[in-house]
Amino acid sequence: MDPRIMYYTVLLTTAARVYGQTIKPGVDSVSDQPTWANPLFTYPVDCPAAKLSKVSPSQLRCPRIFDDENRGLVAYPAVIRSLSVGNNLGDIHTQGEYVHKVLYRTTCSTGFFGGQTIEKALVEMKLAPREVGVYDTTTASALYFPAPRCQWYTDNVHNDLTFYYTTAKSVLRDPYTLGFLDSDFIEGKCSKSPCQTHWSNVVWKGDSGVAACDTGSEIKGHIFVDKTSHHVVKATSYGHHPWGLHRACMITFCGKPWIRTDLGDLIAIEYNGGATLLAFPACKDTTVGMRGSLDDFAYLDDLVKSSESREECLEAHAEIIATNSVTPYLLSKFRSPHPGINDVYAMHDGSIYHGKCMTVAIDEVSKDRRTYRAHQTSAFVAWGHPFGDEWGGFHGLHGNDTPVIPDLEKYVAQYKVSMMDKMDIRPVPHPSVQILYNDTDTADITIRKIDSFDLQSLNWSFWPSLSALGGVPILLALVFFLYCCMNRRPSMPAAPQEIPMYHLASRG
């Protein structure tokens, strides 16, 4: 063995026990290209609407944005391997479905003179994860309201049908823990299917899968060493976010040793022409998970966040919340400049959509802006549109004939003002509200949510009949007659009401 390599190996083993990993290679291995930089652009791939969820403005999150400041550091060439992100199904996402439990209720209230009010309500029925699979399910297209049952001079006669039905929904799987990640889950994650969502009557279920233990392809990059302490502080490769190594440690996963980086990625690094495998002290715990599972402030030691871009995003977020509206330009501020699995956002038909999808580095955009070439590829491909049209893409990309890319458009002297077009944001609807019913006449049907006592839910349908009788004298005579001669009006016990309730009301 080369005496130099033997010396470095001893140095690494000794220093790692005390100070963390240190490196002091020979001068001949210093890189001529130590600077790391962001790609021209990033864009999601394989991210259809089924992998997205509607979110409110407060749920938007600005991405981490890192600088390439390397003062006081020396870069050395290295080969970096990462655990392949995926599972035995061959995708970072898991196909699944929402299971809904909803009561479809038709209520009839009949007045003395025959006037009727027909109300149609969707009532949440609490669904526990253990119930999933016990009952047969149907599809949303098979839902319908039962026919009204009306009784003369009687309020609130209910006719109920309870449905268990499914709607398609894909979520991101954590390849390390096999957990599931989605903004609809409580705390945004779930360890095992079936998973409870924010809505009491909606549960998600999907395939469990097994961990993917294959090693990803080798990529060329650099490790950065502090000139004074000789500590290894980070590793970089074009087309990837930087890996912080200030708190790095060794952990065993899938039967192999890995470096757990500051934010939880598992990687392996070779340097000195592949002769030496970078190693750190053993981790004090066995925590593994998707990027960001560890301390969010770990990168602040060296990989300083680009404050200007971060502040622009925070200002955009504040404006979206304050105005309850969004423009393509404002939404572009939420695009992560680093490839990999990232939060992605799109705007469509009054709603903001969020998902976690793979984004790729883009080296070149065609002159007509209709296609792009991703890093380490030669073919140009079209932009992905999650909603099947050519107008709306991710992070503000929009346009029919010539796509408008706000992040690039802002540098053009005569920029397209369409990126400033405002879209008012609607409230996020309940996922179980399916405007599907068996009525042929939908005139005057409205939808409302009942959170408390509502006068509109009472039976006022006899007023049109009274107005046709000729005025106040007849009304007074009628009241006197009812008071003196009629028996007490029968009443029906009110059925227990779940909250919230959605009403589709039509007055007859």
Curated annotation (Swiss-Prot):
It is found in: Virion membrane. Homotrimer. Interacts with matrix protein. InterPro entries: Rhabdo_glycop_CD (IPR055447), Rhabdo_glycop_FD (IPR001903), Spike_prot (IPR002417). Residues 483-508 are intravirion. It is a single-pass type I membrane protein. GO terms for cellular component: membrane; viral envelope; virion membrane. It comes from Hirame rhabdovirus (strain Korea/CA 9703/1997) (HIRRV). Attaches the virus to host cellular receptor, inducing endocytosis of the virion. In the endosome, the acidic pH induces conformational changes in the glycoprotein trimer, which trigger fusion between virus and cell membrane. The chain crosses the membrane at residues 462-482. Belongs to the novirhabdovirus glycoprotein family. This is Glycoprotein. GO terms for biological process: symbiont entry into host cell; virion attachment to host cell. Residues 21-461 are virion surface. Glycosylated by host. Glycosylation is crucial for glycoprotein export at the cell surface. Changing S217P: In strain: Isolate 8601H. Residues 1-20 form the signal peptide. Changing R71Q: In strain: Isolate 8401H and Isolate 8601H. It comes from the Viruses. Changing L245P: In strain: Isolate 8401H and Isolate 8601H. Keywords: Glycoprotein, Host-virus interaction, Membrane, Signal, Transmembrane, Transmembrane helix, Viral attachment to host cell, Viral envelope protein, Virion, Virus entry into host cell.
